[in-house]
Amino acid sequence: MLDVEQSTVVHHAGGARPRLIEAGRLLVFLVAGTMGFAAAGQETDDASRAYGELLAQALDGRGLVDYPRLVDRRGVVDAYVDRLAAPGLLHEQQPEAQRLATLINAYNAFTLRLIIDHYDAGRLSSITDLHGGKPWDVAEWTLSGQRVSLNQIEHEHIRENFNEPRIHWALVCAAWSCPPLRHELYTAEDLDRQLADQERRVLLKGDRRFIQLEGDDETAARVTPLFEWYGQDFGNWREYSNQRRPGPRLRFVGFLDYDWRLNAQPSP
């Protein structure tokens, strides 16, 4: 399961203590921990609401980002990133859907924060220009009290613990060929619907960033290289794709080139 911090009761050498004292101390410990989680949750609500509203304002219909708007309102992004740092945010007693939604949101928020940190008035052209071309390996983020990199979130926390291939339509690496960002945060209650919608946006909506049909009958297809990179997560990715598309079966003739240009909205 996820590598989260857990509080433990330490038994000291030197003889048994009166059970009443031990019970009292344990009760104080548990109450304090519960109050801490409640306080963190209350802070989360306000930060999440403001951040979700900003996403709705800063994204267009293709999921491309108005980065100047995010730069102007980076305080909202910072507050949400700070909220993600709270110890216990990924507590093991939470439902799996809650933890997965939090991990997806964290990956995407940290990526946006990385871009606005280096946006440089629009001169940044690609996330691959940062950290020697390997920004995903830098453990510069704090999630649930732990320092992590984007790659650790994706591979160690998500892929190793959740059998959910649709996460590849939800994790957004700030590139033109990445899946579209949503105009909202992922939530435990709506996660299945949200992931299904992301899958439709990638596989069914005719966006040539992800799938291009060729031939007179449009049954030959070039598809996103995400299938090439993460094919094992989908099982038989060819069958996976065809089962989710209406009409005649597609023949997959190759992978599209991945476009690492920034997923920014075109300048007006």
Question: Positions of the model-derived regions?
Answer:
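N-terminal secretory signal peptides that target proteins for export/translocation
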Residues: M1-I21
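Alpha-helical transmembrane segments and their juxtamembrane interfaces
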Residues: A13-G15, A32-M35, H118
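Bacterial N-terminal signal peptides
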Residues: A23-M35
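Boundary at the C-terminal end of the N-terminal hydrophobic targeting segment
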Residues: A38-E43
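Interaction/scaffold regions that mediate signaling and macromolecular assembly across diverse proteins
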Residues: T44-H91, A97-T102, T111-P268
